[in-house]
Amino acid sequence: MKLVVGLGNPGKKYEHTRHNIGFDIIDRCAQKLDLPLDKQKFKAIYGEKRIGSEKVVLLKPLTYMNLSGEAVRPFMDYFNISNDELVVIYDDLDLPVGKIRLRKKGSAGGHNGIKSLIAHLGTEDFNRIRVGIGRPAHGEPVVHYVLDTYRKEELAFMNEAAEKSAKAIEAWLEKPFLEVMNTFN
């Protein structure tokens, strides 16, 4: 089984904000794979489907970002999913707008959703796709920046990043994550 988690905040208020790029990419994957998110368990909505010989689960936590681990860990335990069968997709202030970076492990880098996952999983060793949202303009508070929607000039870059991330997930269904990293980084 392969589990793909997109991080974000629940509710209309946060739809299509920078911090919710993980949710947006899960939605894109669901559309590409014809895999509706029609189930709910452990503070998350998800969908599952067998693709070839692999069962794939797409998941969006219903907790707020900084509590993401509370939704993901029970789900992984219940379905007996290992850390190398997990990919987490999330926004990254330290990457330029629209740039993606795949990693097999790493620190939270100040991201509260990843901090929560590390705390609940007990390790930094899990696959991730970091999606660049850039940094706020001088003086703009980070919290306002990440919870805001994209500027018009950012939309094409973010759409491209979402598409590339979805393609990386599709590739991971057939290849080891390290191979996918080498292709998409």
Swiss-Prot record:
Query: Where exactly is the site Stabilizes the basic form of H active site to accept a proton?
Result: 91
Signal peptide positions (record): none
Database matches in InterPro entries? Pept_tRNA_hydro, Pept_tRNA_hydro_CS, Pept_tRNA_hydro_sf
Give the enzyme's EC designation. Answer: 3.1.1.29
Top EC group:
hydrolase
- Catalytic residue list: 19
* Entry GO MF terms: peptidyl-tRNA hydrolase activity; tRNA binding
What Gene3D superfamilies does the annotation carry?
A: Peptidyl-tRNA hydrolase (3.40.50.1470)
**One Pfam family it belongs to:** Pept_tRNA_hydro
Q: What is its main location?
A: cytoplasm
At what residues does the UniProt record annotate the site feature described as Discriminates between blocked and unblocked aminoacyl-tRNA? 9
Question: What subcellular locations does the record give?
Answer: Cytoplasm
Write out the GO biological process terms. Answer: protein quality control for misfolded or incompletely synthesized proteins; rescue of stalled ribosome
The record's keywords, sorted A to Z, are: Cytoplasm, Hydrolase, RNA-binding, tRNA-binding
Reactions catalysed? an N-acyl-L-alpha-aminoacyl-tRNA + H2O = an N-acyl-L-amino acid + a tRNA + H(+)
UniProt binding sites for tRNA? 14, 64, 66, 112
What SUPFAM superfamilies does this protein's entry cite? Answer: Peptidyl-tRNA hydrolase-like (SSF53178)
Q: Which GO terms describe its cellular component?
A: cytoplasm
Q: Write out the similarity annotation.
A: Belongs to the PTH family.
Describe its function.
Answer: Hydrolyzes ribosome-free peptidyl-tRNAs (with 1 or more amino acids incorporated), which drop off the ribosome during protein synthesis, or as a result of ribosome stalling. Catalyzes the release of premature peptidyl moieties from peptidyl-tRNA molecules trapped in stalled 50S ribosomal subunits, and thus maintains levels of free tRNAs and 50S ribosomes.
Subunit-structure text: Monomer.
- PANTHER family, per the entry: PEPTIDYL-TRNA HYDROLASE (PTHR17224:SF1)
**Protein name (database record):** Peptidyl-tRNA hydrolase
The source organism is: Shouchella clausii (strain KSM-K16)
